[in-house]
């Protein structure tokens, strides 16, 4: 099992992402404790669904 240490760095710049995301796994955790597979999927959820979510940290969310 691969474990990603949380990284509380700067939030992703969502302006750089289009609607098409890659399948790379570089997890990101949002304020609702939901893990996204990468920055692009997080940003698309935030922008396209007008979701009230915010960046928490890079890495998987802990349950």
Curated annotation (Swiss-Prot):
Sequence ranges assigned to domain Kazal-like in this UniProt record: 8-63
Disulfide bond found in the keyword field: yes
Domain of life: Eukaryota
Tissue localization of expression: Seminal plasma.
Pfam families: Kazal_1 (PF00050)
Signal peptide region: none
Keywords assigned by UniProt, alphabetized: Disulfide bond, Protease inhibitor, Secreted, Serine protease inhibitor
Main location: secreted
Subcellular location: Secreted
Disulfide pattern: 14-43, 21-40, 29-61
Site keyed Reactive bond: positions: 23-24
Molecular functions (GO terms): serine-type endopeptidase inhibitor activity
SMART domains (UniProt xref): KAZAL
UniProt xrefs under SUPFAM superfamilies: Kazal-type serine protease inhibitors (SSF100895)
General function of this protein: Strong inhibitor of acrosin.
Protein name, entry field: Acrosin inhibitor 1
The species this protein was found in: Bos taurus
